[in-house]
Amino acid sequence: AKAELNTLFCSPIAWLILIIFAFQAGLTFSDLISDQLRYLALNYRPYNLTSALLLGYSGVYSSMQDNLYLYIPLLTMGLMSKEYSSGSIKLLYSSPITNIQIILGKYISMLVYALILVAILFAYFIYSACIVENFDFPFALTGILGIFLLVCAYAARGLFMSTLTAYQVVAAVGTLTVLAILNFMGNIGQDIDFVRDLTYWLSLAGRSDKFLHGMICSEDAFYFIIVVVLFLSLSVLKLKFERTTANSLSKMVQYIGVLCVTLLVGYVTSQPKLMCYYDATATKANTLTPPSQEVMTKLDGGLTLTMFVNLLDDNFNKGMPKNRNWEMRKFEDYIRFKPEMKMEYVYYYDHTDNPRLYAQFSGLSDKEIAQRLCDTYDLDFNMFLSPEDIKKVTDSKGINLEEEGNRFVYLFERENGQKAFLRIYDDNQRDPRESEITAALKTMVVKSPQVAFITGHGERDIYKGGERDYSAFAKNLTFRYSLINQGFGVSVLDLKADSMATDIADNIDFIVIADVREAYTPDVIAKIQRFIARGGNMIIACEPRRQPLMNPLVENLGITFMPGIVVEETEGY
C-alpha cells in the first residue's frame, strides 16, 4: 500500500485531481456563503444552515458527490493496468505475496486517497461549525460518511476494471461504463417482479443520498460494504486465474458463486425486519413524528396495504408494476416502524370520472377503452379485472369502490378486519403526506372524531360545491385538507326533521352550525344546549345581518353577536 501511494503521488494526475476537487468545493462553498449573506442583507431569516451550506440540494457535499464519478476512474485506471503494460506484474507474481495482498495493497492506497478527499470536505465542516449557530454536527458527519463510502465503492469497481486490461484508457472508460450501468440499473426490468427487486438492489443511484439527508440505514451501509467485497473478490479471482491453470467452467462456477453469495447477503440485509436506522438530524426530520409513532405502536397484528388501480383513472400509472419500488418508498418511514407490513395490488377497469379519456375515446365502451390503453402502454389486458370481477373482490372485503369514484385508492387492512381508505388528491403533489397517512391509520386504533353539520334551517351544505357551501371542507375525497381525509367522520344532522329524538346522538363530538337563515325552535335550541352541557363541542359561524337568528344559540354561553359590520377603510378602494 505504501509503495502504491508513492507511485500514485508521483503521478501528476493525483495532484491535479486534488487541486481541481479543492477548487470546485471552494467555489461552490463561496457561492453558498454569498447567497446566505445576500439573504441576510435582504432581512430574510436564515434557517437550516447546516443543510443549506453542506448537505442540501445545492450544498457543497451534494455538489461534490455528483462529480466523484469523474475523478475516481482517472485514479484507478492504472492500479493494475500499468503493472500489465510495464511487465512488472511478473515481479509481483514471483514475490512472496498472495493475490489478496496485492489487491488489498492497491485498494488501501485508494482508501488513503479517499480520506484525503474527505479531509478537504472536512475543512468546510469545521468552518461551517464555527460560523453557524446550533450547527448540526451528527447530520454533517453523516454526509461525510456517505461520500467516503461512495468513493470506496467507486474505487473497488475501478480496481476490478483495471485488472481486466493493460490499457489505462480502456480501464478508465470501462469504469465509467460500469458506473453508468449501475446508476441506470434501477430502471431495468421494473415490470418483472424478480428482476425488479434484483436490479433495484444492484442500482447505485441514490445510495449515498440518505446519508446526505442525515439518515444512516443498515441496508445502504451494507450495500457499500457488499459491493466493495464483491469487486475485490472478483479482482482476486482474476489474478488467481492468471497465475493458475483452470478451465472455463471452473472459472465461471467461481465467478457465479461470488455473485450468488453477494446477492444472498444483499437480499438478507435488505429485509425490512432486519434493517436498522439512525436519524442523525437534530430535528429527526427523517423520522415519523411522535404522534405518528404512537399510532404505529398501537397497530398490533398484521397490516396490509392494498392498492386498487383502475386503468381508466388518470392516476393508474402510479400503481403499475414498474413503479412499485417508488410506491414502497412513499411508505418507507412507516415500514420502518411496521416492517411486517405487506403491499398488494389489485388491477381492474371500471367507469370513473375521467372526461378527458372518454372524450379521447368517444363512442367506445369501458372494456374497449381499457383494451386500447393496454395496447398503447404494452400492458397485459388479462391482469385487469372486469367490473363484475372487481365487484366480487370488493364485496368479499366489505368495501365499495364506487363510493370512492373508482379512483386510484389505497386500503389499509388490519389482521382484525379493520379497514381505512387512503386517497390521492387533485393538487400538485397528489401523493398523501404523513398527516394524511397517519390520519387514515389512526382511524383503526382510536375512535374518529365525529362532526355533524346541522341542516334544516338554511345552513351551508356539505354536499354542494358552491362558494357558500362546505363540500371541499367536509367531504371532498380529492381535497387533501377536507375533514374526511384528516381522520374525521362527517355526517349531517337535521334537527328540524329529527324532532322525535330527545338528544343529539352520543357518538357526535362536534356540531357545526353555519349561517342559519331560519330561526331555531325552542326544542331545537334545547337539544343543542343539552349537547354542549354534556361536553360536546360546537363550531358556529354567523354571517352579517344574521345576528338575530344566531344569538339564541349562544346567549346561554355568555356570547352575543353584536349588530353591524366592522369595516376598515382602505385608501383607494
Functional labels for PLM-detected ranges:
Residues L37, D191, D209-L212, S218, ...:
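Short, surface-exposed patches at the edges or C-terminal ends of soluble domains, predominantly
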Residues I72-T76, Y124, A156-R157, S235, ...:
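Hydrophobic/aromatic residues in alpha-helical transmembrane segments
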Residues L32-L55, A171-T244:
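Terminal transmembrane helical anchor/hairpin motif
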Residues I13-F23, Q168-N183:
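Pore- or pathway-lining transmembrane helices of multi-pass membrane proteins that form conduits
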Residues L27-S30, N48-Q65, G105-A166:
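Secretory targeting signals
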Residues P73-Y93, Y107:
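Transmembrane helix boundary and interhelical loop/hinge segments in multi-pass membrane proteins
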Residues A1-Y71, L75, L237-T244:
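Hydrophobic alpha-helical transmembrane segments
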